[in-house]
């Protein structure tokens, strides 16, 4: 674990593997996610073969407190400086949800730096979200953006473990419930004590009443490296049609892009089907980084 000061704020980085191995960066999702949580199974598996850096995005995990709005542009600025401080000149990125969206945007801006991408259900692929107007009204209602942290921080460990199980797709369960419960408890307390919103500014900034203010489809067209796109078959957050369209766009300029759908998994598929997710990622990197 390393603590960096980046653009005036703290960034926590978990590092594993040998420095002479190919470097891979992992970027987690939004809301109550952090590196220790979503990459619980993948991080150690990658560390046996590669030089791995799992970065806590600002206002997640060990990367707090932060002041001001952390929109797309500011997060990209912070990540770019973080990569520079870590001495990463050419590397691969694995991103999930918000982390996948950030990976797409960085790869489109700096194609010479990215060797390959793995995108677990990246954010930013659609024009709408389900219940768009209701979501927008929720965001605009005073007090709603911190409602969950105020509720969750009062929970005892058994209730947090029960909450953990509810985010897993039916028929799947956490392999390490005690450890993941402790991590989730840390994240809940961190959000509450730092007075953070439940949702990230990256998400909030996209929501309008009837459509999303931006998507990353043009950036997807700019991806030049081999890319593995992974979706949980039962996911309700990123649609199959959105993933298929993105893969087709990525292929337009001749880039290698492949979509794999993992059965009996949802949005957090690295935790729901860790053995299959790990196998797909390792096979892809063995092919593209060898």
Question: In which residue ranges do the predicted regions lie?
Answer:
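Flexible "cap/lid" loop of the alpha/beta hydrolase fold
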Residues: 108, 117-150
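Conserved alpha/beta-hydrolase catalytic His-Asp/Glu region
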Residues: 151-225
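Active-site loop/oxyanion-hole signature of alpha/beta-hydrolase fold enzymes
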Residues: 53-94, 130, 279
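Conserved loop-alpha-helix segment in the C-terminal half of the alpha/beta-hydrolase fold
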Residues: 44, 222-265
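Catalytic active-site module of serine/aspartate enzymes centered on a nucleophile-bearing elbow/loop
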Residues: 253-290
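N-terminal cap/lid segment of alpha/beta-hydrolase-fold proteins
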Residues: 1-10
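Gly/Ala-rich beta-loop-alpha elbow adjacent to hydrolase catalytic centers
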Residues: 95, 99, 103
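Conserved HGGG/HGGXW glycine-rich cap/lid loop of the alpha/beta-hydrolase fold
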Residues: 9, 15-62
């Amino acid at each position: 674990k390393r603590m960096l000061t980046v653009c005036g704020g703290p960034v926590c980085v978990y590092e594993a593997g040998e420095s002479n191995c190919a470097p891979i960066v992992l970027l987690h999702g939004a809301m109550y996610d952090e590196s220790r949580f979503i990459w619980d199974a993948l991080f150690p598996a990658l560390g046996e073969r590669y030089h791995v850096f799992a970065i806590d995005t600002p206002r997640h995990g060990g990367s707090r407190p932060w002041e001001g709005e952390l929109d797309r542009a500011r997060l990209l600025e912070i990540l770019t400086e973080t990569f520079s401080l870590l001495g990463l000149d050419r590397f691969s990125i694995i991103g999930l949800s918000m982390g996948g969206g950030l990976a797409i945007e960085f790869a489109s801006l700096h194609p010479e730096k990215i060797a390959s991408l793995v995108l677990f259900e990246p954010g930013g692929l659609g024009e709408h979200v389900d219940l768009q107007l209701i979501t927008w009204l929720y965001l605009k209602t005073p007090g709603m953006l911190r409602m969950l942290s105020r509720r969750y921080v009062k929970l005892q460990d058994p209730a947090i473990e029960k909450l953990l199980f509810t985010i897993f797709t039916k028929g799947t369960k956490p392999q390490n419930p005690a450890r993941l419960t402790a991590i989730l408890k840390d994240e809940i307390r961190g959000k509450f004590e730092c007075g953070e919103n439940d949702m990230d500014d990256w998400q909030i900034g996209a929501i309008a009443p009837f459509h999303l203010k931006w998507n990353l489809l043009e950036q997807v067209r700019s991806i030049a490296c081999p890319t593995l796109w992974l979706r949980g078959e039962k996911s309700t957050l990123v649609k199959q049609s959105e993933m298929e369209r993105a893969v087709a766009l990525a292929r337009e300029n001749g880039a290698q892009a492949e979509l794999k759908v993992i059965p009996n998994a949802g949005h957090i598929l690295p935790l729901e089907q860790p053995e299959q997710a790990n196998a797909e990622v390792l096979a892809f990197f063995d092919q593209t980084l060898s």
